[in-house]
UniProtKB/Swiss-Prot annotation:
Part of the 30S ribosomal subunit. Contacts proteins S5 and S12. GO terms for molecular function: rRNA binding; structural constituent of ribosome. This is Small ribosomal subunit protein uS8. InterPro entries: Ribosomal_uS8, Ribosomal_uS8_CS, Ribosomal_uS8_sf. One of the primary rRNA binding proteins, it binds directly to 16S rRNA central domain where it helps coordinate assembly of the platform of the 30S subunit. Pfam families: Ribosomal_S8. It comes from the Bacteria. The keyword S-adenosyl-L-methionine does not apply. Belongs to the universal ribosomal protein uS8 family. Keywords: Ribonucleoprotein, Ribosomal protein, RNA-binding, rRNA-binding. GO terms for biological process: translation. One of its GO terms (cellular component) is ribonucleoprotein complex. It comes from Mycoplasmopsis agalactiae (strain NCTC 10123 / CIP 59.7 / PG2).
Length: 131
């Protein structure tokens, strides 16, 4: 199956698994998705993730995080889409919910949070907001 926007597909899979209270979710592998999941892990939105399989069957198994009966992820939104790319310069990077959430940005130095991009003084494509 061909997916036109793999990052949106990953976000929808995570949101659907959260709504159904699943412990894990499988996502087709890509380097960019692995970097995004690394950010989610460092920011405390997921418990862990591991890479499984090889070649075309390679997947990312994500262990979702819950606090009691409540998901650690309140909402996860895709910002820049294939039909409408959204870019931000280093001095125009905004935060989500006054710093409560996380902005994920793809820069020339890799995928990082808005805070890291400010420290590195780089802008880029705004991939997603999560809180």
């Amino acid at each position: 199956m061909f997916i036109t926007d793999p990052i949106s597909d990953m976000i929808v899979r995570i949101k659907n698994a959260n709504q159904r209270k699943f412990k894990t979710v499988l996502i087709p592998y890509s380097n960019k998705k692995a970097k995004i999941l690394e950010i989610l892990l460092n920011e405390g939105y997921i418990s862990s993730f591991v890479t499984k399989g090889e070649g075309k069957d390679k997947t990312l198994e994500v262990a979702l995080k819950y606090k009691g009966n409540q998901s650690a992820i309140i909402d996860f939104k895709r910002i820049s889409k294939p039909g409408l790319r959204v870019y931000a310069a280093a001095n125009n990077l905004s935060s989500v919910l006054s710093g409560y959430g996380t902005v994920i940005i793809s820069t020339s130095k890799g995928v990082m949070t808005e805070k890291q991009a400010r420290k590195e003084n780089v802008g880029g494509e705004v991939l997603a907001y999560i809180w």
